[in-house]
């Protein structure tokens, strides 16, 4: 936890796919001004005082790779430098970059093919090493850098990516994969798959001076019992399906943690689960409460809390209102070796969170900065994360609002 706690306060623009179970996708009419007066955020609890959050990071997902010019090594280096300069100017101290979104690699790998996101073709060598450049550019600016890995996903659908390289282990070992809803995923139950993921993690930390490894919320892709029936019958040894699946995920998480700490104890391992922990446990088969409360699984947990103040479901429940669910996470039992940070949804700027609550907060130009105040007055929360980079720094649709949010965040971090 030394690296995570050495950070002064966290803005983590993690590009995690918006998959939280309580999240709605409804979108209000578009506009690019912020003249509306939003409701004030809830008043802090009596006696609450502001404190510096310990970590501030910017993360980039595969969805945001359009901000990079990958036409040449020089062009890529320049665009990475520009991005990281903006992070520093805002007051951030860490970047989290997605390096394996689809069983591929944004770096030179002996295990996984080059990502199609660099050249347009999976397996095609771009002629330079994006991760090596990003590590150098980050560290030259005193930014920490974490490599973000999606452990199981090979294809989101038949178009993403459209074609797998011949060298892809999902093709050379097709028996390691399972289809689900048009996508393709490694089978979490197989020891061979768990070894591949651990080996892939170690390849990154052994070859690159990254400061951490992060997994996002994508573990099991479905609750359908038919997804892994053959493996269940062969390997479950009488255990109930949900329990068995959670044990498979727990085994992977602990194996990755143990391997990292055996090789490079200072490298952090964290997971960014959904903000709705019921979904984590029952749909993703992720026992986040165990990881938080038990040493030896993770260094930090960063739930994706992408809802606004007062967020309300159609059934009238406001459990996932920002001010309530962040407190829910802060109240969960947590081992002293595990840190807690919160993910914030920059992609909601100008769009809203789809709840039954007042949406004008997302047109205020300072909603995320208000959230930083709430987090800084919530004991147990040590940092924050914003999904996602280009929605704050290069927002083509709501640029004026994003600039206002960025300015408010910068001022808040400098105060």
Write out the residue ranges for each language-model feature:
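Active-site-adjacent "subsite" loops/lids of carbohydrate-active enzymes
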Residues: 47-78, 146-147, 152-207, 357-361
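C-terminal motif of bacterial Sec signal peptides marking the signal peptidase cleavage site
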Residues: 18-19
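Polysaccharide-binding and catalytic clefts of secreted carbohydrate-active enzymes
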Residues: 76, 93, 141, 170-294, ...
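Aromatic- and glycine-enriched glycan-recognition loops and surfaces
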Residues: 71-90, 117-141, 247-254
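Substrate-binding cleft of secreted/luminal carbohydrate-active enzymes
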Residues: 294-323, 328-415
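Aromatic-lined carbohydrate-binding/catalytic grooves of carbohydrate-active enzymes
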Residues: 90-126
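Aromatic- and acidic-residue-enriched segments that line the glycan-binding/catalytic groove
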Residues: 107-119, 153-181, 217-237, 356-361
